[in-house]
Amino acid sequence: MTLLRSEAPAARRKKVLFAGEIAGWDSWGRIFQDIGLFKPLIQEICRIHSLPFSEPEHLTPGTNAVFAVGEMVFKIYAPAEAGFDQSADCDTEIFAMQRSRKAGVSVPEVIATGILHDRYDFRYLVQSRCPGKAFREIWPMPDHTKTVPAAVSGTVPAAADSVGYSPDPAKTAFARSLRRLLAPLNTPCEIFNNIDVILDPERGKRWDPFPEDFREDRLRIIAGLCETVWKPESFVFVHGDLNEDNILIDGNRISLLDFGDACLAPIEYEYALAATELFRLDKAFLQGFFPEYYDRAAARLLDELADLITRGILIHDFGGDVLRQRFGLCESLHSTEMLRDFIRSRL
């Protein structure tokens, strides 16, 4: 690992700062938001890097221990003892933020990074705190899980109007700006981590709750696309987790947060999550984000957009979770065509 100028060399101390017990992922899940446990580590990081300390505050929980300290954000990664060593995510985030900043995208500034050798080896990253409101604060998304599942049990709604579409220029303008922001990011890039979005079996486990016939069809479709369309040399850099907490809006400025899931992938990987997880297939957003499919009133173009979103969600690490948690889709899906028809009905 190449040391940043702001990175502290690893050093062992006799005094143990962390009083928590980490033995598996469940134990990490119970403690990773505990300010009392992580405060001594944060104080030590501040001492090492001569950073001002103030009382830590909670931020939106994710996978790692993340706290606000004044105008800084401290991220302490789950150690190997948690069962899933997240420290590699730190290298991914640093690379991704540096690349994004060079592309003119507003992202947090890396202030310090390093490893604390305590009771456990804790990789950490200190970033600046970006101003603005999270996307979820401006546009709270509706819960579709109570209204959608019946739509795919047999017949699919005939038109997007049936789910309550109404024009919203502000939504459309924002989505258009986000697409422009992503343009210099979603470009070819050198390999910067070992994530395989297509073949990694661990990334397919979120599809386990789905019916067997759907899972088999999903794998068949992916295999066919790998033979014809998806070649590694055509993959681009993607943020990988464009959700309602990872986008901040401050006037006309859009900031992107949390690049831990950045990777190389087909462009559909990025676009599909934006369409489903971020925009929840809200047509007002989709019109701004995908103008090339909406600017001309052609059903064929919307068919192509439905295909694109379907392909992307089938390979996304969070694809299965998004369909279940945001749209209530799981047991009623028996083919990828049913999923594609559902998506098409919302366009």
PLM regions and their residue ranges:
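Juxta-kinase regulatory segment immediately upstream of eukaryotic protein kinase catalytic domains
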Residues: 2-53
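Active-site activation/catalytic loop segments of kinase-like enzymes and analogous catalytic loops
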Residues: 268-298, 310-342
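Short, flexible/disordered intra-domain loops and linkers
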Residues: 26-31, 80-89, 321-333
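Short glycine/proline-enriched coil/turn segments at helix->beta-strand junctions
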Residues: 51-52, 69-72, 103-106, 250-253, ...
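An alpha-helical support segment within catalytic cores of ATP-dependent transferases
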Residues: 33-49, 115-118, 148, 156, ...
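Short beta-strand segments
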Residues: 75-76, 112, 237-240, 256-258, ...
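Active-site acidic catalytic loop and adjacent metal/ATP-binding pocket
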Residues: 62-70, 220-271
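ATP-binding pocket architecture of kinase catalytic cores
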Residues: 56-192
